[in-house]
C-alpha cells in the first residue's frame, strides 16, 4: 500500500467521508467537514502510523490532503 493510500484510508476512517472525496486538493475543513478536534485526531493518527512527530506549528499549516502527504514524505 502506498503512502497516499495509507493517508487516504486514515482520513476516510477518522472523518467518515467517502474515499472518492479524499483528493489531494481537498481541504479538511471546507471540503471534508473536519472540525478542530477532527484535525487533532487526524494528526495524531498520522504521527502514530508513520512514526513521526508533527509540531502544533506545523500542524496548523496542514490544511489539505496534499499538505499531509508532502509533510510525511519530507519527514520519513
Swiss-Prot record:
Residues 1-76 form the Carrier domain. Pathway: Lipid metabolism; fatty acid biosynthesis. Keywords: Cytoplasm, Fatty acid biosynthesis, Fatty acid metabolism, Lipid biosynthesis, Lipid metabolism, Phosphopantetheine, Phosphoprotein. GO terms for biological process: lipid A biosynthetic process. SUPFAM superfamilies: ACP-like. GO terms for cellular component: cytosol; membrane. Its main location: cytoplasm. Signal peptide: none annotated. It holds the Pfam family PP-binding. GO terms for molecular function: acyl binding; acyl carrier activity. It is found in: Cytoplasm. Coiled coil: none annotated. The modification O-(pantetheine 4'-phosphoryl)serine is found at residue 36. 4'-phosphopantetheine is transferred from CoA to a specific serine of apo-ACP by AcpS. This modification is essential for activity because fatty acids are bound in thioester linkage to the sulfhydryl of the prosthetic group. Belongs to the acyl carrier protein (ACP) family. PANTHER family: ACYL CARRIER PROTEIN, CARRIER DOMAIN-CONTAINING PROTEIN. HAMAP family: Acyl_carrier (MF_01217). Carrier of the growing fatty acid chain in fatty acid biosynthesis. This is Acyl carrier protein. It comes from Desulfatibacillum aliphaticivorans. The lineage of its organism: Bacteria, Pseudomonadati, Thermodesulfobacteriota, Desulfobacteria, Desulfobacterales. The gene is acpP.
Amino acid at each position: 500500500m502506498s503512502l497516499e493510500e495509507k493517508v487516504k484510508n486514515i482520513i476516510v476512517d477518522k472523518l467518515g467521508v467517502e474515499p472518492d472525496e479524499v483528493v489531494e486538493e481537498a481541504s479538511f475543513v471546507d471540503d471534508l467537514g473536519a472540525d478542530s478536534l477532527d484535525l487533532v485526531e487526524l494528526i495524531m493518527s498520522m504521527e502514530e502510523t508513520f512514526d513521526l512527530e508533527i509540531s502544533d506549528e506545523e500542524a496548523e499549516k496542514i490544511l489539505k490532503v496534499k499538505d499531509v502527504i508532502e509533510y510525511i514524505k519530507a519527514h520519513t
